[in-house]
Amino acid sequence: LTAANNLPVDTPPFPLNTTFKYNSMPHDKMQEYVNVDYNREMSVVALTGEPDQEVIIAEARYVKDDKSAYGELAFVVDEKYHGLGIATYLYEMLIRLAKERGLKGFTAEVLQANTGMMRVFEKGRLPINAHVRNGLSQLTIPFEEKPVKATDENI
């Protein structure tokens, strides 16, 4: 796996702009992923392989900010499975699960060069508010669009 803060459809919570390969994860870090408080965070995975021999090839998660009721997104997809729509599918699942749990939307930080991750969000058909600074796009993705008043300009 390649891990980097929201790089090509990936990211656990590691320092921004850090890219590295890993074959295993320390036990204490793994505990954050296997002991999930589903009231605050949600994690979904994609598997491949035969029953009882499945391998995790992708993970997507959000962690809820209690003050804003928005969830911060993170994705990890094994390099061999990039470009197959897995992150898009997991993103759609997280949208549904977050709405069911009363979240108002998502936030994410994506490097501008990470066009693959931006395509995932664009396919989600939700409005995306982006603020770009120093090559980093800070995204806010509300679940409900604000109503637009009919004016001569938008009719």
Predicted regions: what is each one?
Residues 1-155:
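Long, contiguous binding/interaction regions
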